[in-house]
A protein has these predicted regions:
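Hydrophobic alpha-helical segments that form the core
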Residues: 128, 133, 178-197, 210-217
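Amphipathic alpha-helical packing segments from all-alpha helical-bundle domains
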Residues: 104, 108, 144-170, 182
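Amphipathic alpha-helical segments used for helix-helix packing
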Residues: 110, 124-145
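C-terminal peripheral helix-coil segments that are non-catalytic and often amphipathic
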Residues: 2-26, 114-119, 155-159, 163-167, ...
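Hydrophobic alpha-helical connector segments
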Residues: 84, 98-128, 180-187
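Generic hydrophobic, amphipathic alpha-helix propensity
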Residues: 35-44, 60, 85-89, 93, ...
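Helix-turn-helix
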Residues: 24, 38, 46-80, 84
Length: 228
């Protein structure tokens, strides 16, 4: 019986060491806790600054403060992470635009979407332009899904503006025979231009003046309130 005790003791020691090694490995492999929204915001900033193709997994995980296994477990692959970042971009950057479209008077709509675009670009410490424009222009053939998605979102954006002008026409707020297609594409061209030009960091008052002139050009298609 005395000879059996050392053998049992040694087995228990070996088992304990094995158990400790397993626990250490599990602990090391366990992802650190992190704020998902903040991590996604950091990923959005990388995609916005470097583009989809230019953003490497190393760039993304370093900015997010997580490792690759944690990224895959939480957000999926790079493409899935990008689309979640785009949804965040749409909700945050698009909110002022969507609320502007709901104003009853088309003159107020026009003035607001241009002034808010200029203000948003002037308020950013690092102007990055428009994520959707950059994604649609700077994607390789391998990233065609991303490019198609960006083009689809831009088409939806254009359609929203056209729908609002059509509503204004039906409400008698536009001059007779106003060319809604031309108005729509003029508005989109000028809004795109403001966002692209903001990358050059022009003086804020310059962007605001350009936005004001663009809005005034569209006012020529709008009836004054007294005539409605």
């Amino acid at each position: 019986m005395d000879n059996a005790r050392p053998a049992i003791y040694h087995l228990s020691v070996i088992f304990e060491k094995l158990l400790n090694n397993v626990m250490v490995r599990l602990t090391c492999g366990r992802p650190k806790s992190f704020d998902k929204e903040i991590a996604l915001e950091k990923a959005l900033d990388v995609f916005w600054t470097q583009g989809y193709d230019g953003a490497s997994l190393k760039d993304l995980t370093q900015a997010m403060g997580i490792n690759k296994p944690s990224m895959y477990a939480t957000f999926g692959n790079k493409e899935q992470l990008y689309f979640q970042a785009v949804e965040m971009y749409k909700n945050r950057e698009g909110a002022p635009f969507f609320s502007a479209l709901e104003q009853p008077q088309i003159r107020d709509v026009i003035e607001t979407i241009f002034s808010r675009t200029a203000e948003a670009k002037c308020s950013n410490e690092k102007n990055k332009g428009c994520l959707m424009i950059q994604s649609s222009l700077a994607c390789s053939d391998e990233s065609s899904v991303v490019k198609i998605s960006a083009l689809k979102m831009r088409a939806e954006f254009i359609q929203l503006i056209q729908n609002r002008f059509e509503r204004a026409a039906n409400d008698g707020q536009l001059v007779q025979n106003a060319d809604i297609q031309v108005m729509t594409h003029y508005a989109v061209t000028m809004l795109d231009g403001l966002q692209i030009h903001s990358i050059d960091s022009p003086p804020p008052e310059m962007l605001e003046s350009v936005a004001k002139i663009a809005a005034e050009h569209l006012f020529q298609f709008c009836l004054p309130l007294s005539s409605q």
